[in-house]
């Protein structure tokens, strides 16, 4: 299965809630100026996630089948990047250490 590009993934999530690895629900508010705008459950903006970080996560997921939910792998907003990645069909959170994985196809 081919993974989407970061901008396509993010645009498809606008207005939708996504869950982080620890179960926190956040909402994707929009995509602007190369970033995904993420809001907390009270409606306030809590992060601007670089589309480049989302794309890097997608690329690593495609190449290696998994990516760690960590700053070094997904950038400063790794938790939110991972929450977006698991919205792709066939992708889920894994345990110990926290990671995002593609299912075998």
Regions found by a protein language model. Give the residues of each.
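Short, cationic-aromatic polyanion-contact patches
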Residues: 96-105
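Surface-exposed polar/charged interaction patches
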Residues: 15-16, 60, 64, 88
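Short amphipathic alpha-helical segments that mediate assembly, nucleic-acid/protein binding
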Residues: 5-6, 54, 78
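Generic beta-strand structural signal
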Residues: 30-31, 93-95
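Short acidic, hydrophobic short linear motifs in intrinsically disordered regions
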Residues: 48-73
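Short amphipathic alpha-helical interaction segments
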Residues: 71-87, 93-94
